[in-house]
Amino acid sequence: MKKKLCAALLAAAALAALTGCGGSGEGNTADAEGDKADAGEITVYTALEDEQVTDYLAKFNETYPDIKVNVVRESTGIITAKLIAEKDNPQADVVWGTAASSMMVLDDMDALQPYEPEGCDRILAQFKSDKEVPTWVGIDAWETAFVVNTAELEKLGMTADEITSYEDLLDPRLKGHIVMSNPNSSGTGFLTVSAVLQLKGKDTEEGWNYLDQLHENVAQYVHSGSKPAKMAASGECAVGISFGYAGLSQKEKGAPVEVVFPEEGSGWDLEANALMAKDEINPAAYTFLHWAISDDAMDLYRENYPIVTVENTGEYEGYEGNPLDQLIENDFSWAAKNREDILNQWMEKYDGKSEAES
């Protein structure tokens, strides 16, 4: 099954990181200017939503009509597992819009080529790798949110005002009415589980005790970060543990939902870009990475996510204040180091409620 392969490959990645396994990117740095091209064909792996990929590439093709982009789109966990499996013979030229926590695993395996696209100085320091020449560059951030269907809650004798925190999800009235993402296949699922464990004390049992209780109320774990929001919007569940943009977009379409950002703070991750370490770098890959952090691209990302990795200004529709204030203090290094154990333990405890693979 995909999720078992994903967990196994991520486990291997964590082991390689801890043992210092080298790869084809070790000691190599791409020319800062790159050998850009205005024509060619590249393969891009991404975990961006399908509709986002379509919109973003339409804009890219306006500027570079002679570059053909072959897209492989999967959820974060599947893309990460695929990149790990192909590490010694990478098929992708570029990774685009995939979780920074996954990039850190790949970076520790020397699977990423250090490269600094034009305009990288605009990217805030906390949103790109800390190496002198970055191995990955963030583009936007997404965060845990609860998407609650007010009509379904009313049937349970509840209102949206009663759900403000992680603890509120343990209400016995919600038993069988919550849908959440599987962290093995979904970046949203992993960032949420990681946040709970960090908020409850990282290496203590308190976080797992909470997840045990939450599991009692969960009807199903799905393999997409946005699917819980869509299921809440359609009335298939009362609460979808998803991410902000997914819920707000459903509300904008007229669904009877409210989007709740937990008062303890939201788990979060970055969508980031990277150049794959290969013996020969496709010049069009440099071109794509330059465009992917350009002002044009950032304007597109901002339409979907309130937090982009250049300086954020303006109003944030659907948020009470600056969304940066909603984010927990995320220990990415801890999350990457413990990813194998977290995923294995989660699978052992909760996988029985995961949806069947499509």
Regions found by a protein language model. Give the residues of each.
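Periplasmic-binding protein-like
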Residues: 173-181, 210-214, 222, 253-277, 292-315
